[in-house]
From Swiss-Prot:
InterPro entries on file: M18_aminopeptidase_2, Peptidase_M18, Peptidase_M18_dom2
Name assigned to this protein: Probable M18 family aminopeptidase 2
Annotated family: Belongs to the peptidase M18 family.
Annotated organism of origin: Clostridium novyi (strain NT)
Enzyme class: hydrolase
Top-level taxon of the source organism: Bacteria
Gene that produces this protein: apeB
Binding, Zn(2+): 84, 161, 409
Pfam families: Peptidase_M18 (PF02127)
Secretion signal span: none
Alphabetical list of Gene3D superfamilies matching this protein: Aminopeptidase i, Domain 2 (2.30.250.10), Zn peptidases (3.40.630.10)
Disulfide bonds listed in the record: none
Length: 433
């Protein structure tokens, strides 16, 4: 079994290679290819075999990987872990170039998801995403990933001398206060297509070949292991790449079992999941049904398989805050490095119930992993996640769990080194059943 610190450093490497959902899927694919998985295309007929390993992608930003069990799928079902590839950030708008004070070059952006806005101020920022190029088939243009891994932007604060009330709290305007500066106007500056030309240079293509883009900002600096005893992981995008990384390790390092082991990494969780690659789609259901059909089953066999299946929906949980303990529930107070937290809500914003929670608790016991429970304060409205959304498309028992975090949706979130290791252990135990 891997050393905890080594595994945490592997997480930091994984996150840094994955500045966007597109890059996360690309990083996952590289791991899967190395581990002997074969890629399936949606447009092709699937001929899968028991004991073999496969994956398919959607929109370059979501992925489903699976190891076909050696049992009968309608009798042994699927063991599924779900997570998501996206994180709160800023998306660059079309025609983004702006000038200010006849001096600065700025980019026009919009907020993606629910970031803690002030944590993005005064940070060196880079840009990454997907670029669409002219192709031979007008309906299927060529796409390329781009990552300008340089500190090329920053969102500067307003000096306290010009904003005396800043330490009493101030609301940031998303159209005014959070636009990054890219540089200074000089004699060579041409406003039109300024960013496209920089992207084209990075990709070594003619900028006129670029039709469109999906580009996002990210913190340039890599995450780190911190704490007097190296207890913590400090990084952006822990929500939810921490779960993706732990589940990926669990899938690739587990044995073939009777059931078919599945890892699904959805996109767009942070904006509601209502996309073709999100949890509120038939993406996962279609993949599972195609697995059954390829194994010579029919639709009734598919429904039988679902009744024998189980989903662990893994999305970050809230740890009790050291300075704001009153924000946590009085009796359910997850702590860092005390194990994954089962997420429970009377509103059904989480899928956990006594049955599915008992399954996860038994798994943790078998893996020798501590387990906690998270419930919101009764006077606080919490978030939701992929679990209840995907449950509307699949009739499968499900539990919502997550690694406890501090500063969720900050540009730098915090989790426990032990907890990331615990997550991997229980996921591997689940897949080995």
């Amino acid at each position: 079994m891997k050393n905890k610190i080594k595994f945490a450093n592997e997480l930091l490497d994984f996150i840094y290679k994955s500045p966007t959902a597109f890059h996360a899927v690309d990083t996952i694919k590289k791991v899967l290819n190395k581990e002997g998985f074969s890629e399936l295309k949606e447009c092709e007929k699937w001929n899968i075999e028991k004991g073999k390993k496969y994956y398919m992608t959607k929109n370059d930003s979501a992925i489903v990987a699976f190891v076909v069990g050696n049992g009968e799928v309608h009798e042994d079902g699927f063991k599924i872990i779900g997570a998501h590839t996206d994180s709160p950030t800023f998306r660059i708008k079309p025609n983004p170039e702006m000038t200010s004070e006849q001096s600065y070059i700025k980019l026009n952006t919009e907020v993606y998801g629910g970031p803690i806005l002030n944590t993005w101020i005064d940070r060196p920022l880079a840009v990454a995403g997907r670029v669409t190029l002219k192709g031979e088939n007008i309906l299927f243009p060529e796409t390329k990933l781009v990552n300008i891994n340089k500190p090329i932007m920053i969102i500067p604060n307003l000096a306290i001398h010009m904003n005396r009330n800043i330490n009493q709290g101030i609301e940031l305007n998303r159209q005014v206060d959070t636009l990054p500066i890219l540089g200074l106007i000089n004699d060579k500056f041409e406003k039109n297509d300024y960013l496209l030309k920089a992207i084209a240079k990075e990709l070594d293509v003619d900028y006129k070949e670029i039709i469109d883009f999906d580009l996002f900002l990210y913190e340039y600096e890599k995450g780190s292991i911190i704490g007097i005893e190296n207890e913590f992981v400090s990084s952006g995008r822990l929500d939810d790449l921490e779960a993706v990384h732990a589940a990926l390790e669990g899938l690739t390092q587990s044995n073939v079992s009777k059931a078919t082991n599945v890892l699904v990494c959805f996109d767009n969780e942070e904006v509601g999941s209502s996309t073709k690659q999100g949890a509120d789609s038939n993406m996962l259901a279609n993949v599972l049904e195609r697995i059954v059909i390829s194994l010579n089953g029919d639709r009734e066999d598919f429904f039988r398989a679902l009744s024998k299946s189980f989903i662990i929906s893994s999305d970050s949980a809230h740890a009790v805050h050291p300075n704001k303990g009153e924000k946590c529930d009085p009796t359910n107070r997850p702590k860092l490095n005390k194990g994954p937290a089962i997420k429970i809500a009377a509103s059904q914003s989480y899928t956990s119930d006594s049955n599915s929670s008992s399954v996860f608790k038994a798994l943790c016991s078998k893996a020798d992993v501590p387990v906690q429970e998270f419930v919101n304060r009764s006077d606080e409205r919490g978030g939701s996640t992929i679990g209840p959304i995907s449950s509307t498309h699949l009739n499968i028992r499900s539990v919502d769990i997550g690694t406890p975090l501090l500063a969720m949706h900050s540009i730098r979130e915090l989790c426990g080194v032990d907890d990331h290791y615990y997550g991997m252990k229980v996921f591997k135990e689940f897949y080995n059943l």
